[in-house]
């Protein structure tokens, strides 16, 4: 299984997963992540598939990207977390919350909304 690249700031059991927008990468959130880590979060800045230093694949939809996040959390032994998604990352985060509601403590979406 291919794994997602990430930068982790902080070392607590309060996990905040940050999912960037289209054509972005986790590192785009580093300034905010440093602040959140200082506030007691363990912040995971993830490069989603086909972005940053993560693997590239012709398979590219929100359900698959939600599965990528589940594999990442399993690999890191994270049972439940707060997920913050921006733009495309927000769609991934919402899909993850629908597919794996037991893994989401809180869901934050920015600059995106669900279709009605």
Regions found by a protein language model. Name each.
Residues 18-21, 45:
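Structural cue for short, hydrophobic secondary-structure segments
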Residues 23, 48-52, 114:
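Alpha/beta-hydrolase active-site loop signature
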Residues 35-38, 42-84:
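Active-site loop/oxyanion-hole signature of alpha/beta-hydrolase fold enzymes
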């Amino acid at each position: 299984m291919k794994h997602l690249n990430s930068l982790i700031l902080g070392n607590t059991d309060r996990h905040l997963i940050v999912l960037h927008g289209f054509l972005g990468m986790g590192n785009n959130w580093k300034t905010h992540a440093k602040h959140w880590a200082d506030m007691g979060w363990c912040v995971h800045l993830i490069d989603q598939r086909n972005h940053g230093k993560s693997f590239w694949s012709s398979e590219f939809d929100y359900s698959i990207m939600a599965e990528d996040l589940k594999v990442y959390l399993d690999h890191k032994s994270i049972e439940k977390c707060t997920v913050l998604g921006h733009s495309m990352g927000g769609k991934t985060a919402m899909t993850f919350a629908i597919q794996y509601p037991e893994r989401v403590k809180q869901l934050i979406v920015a600059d995106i909304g669900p279709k009605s």
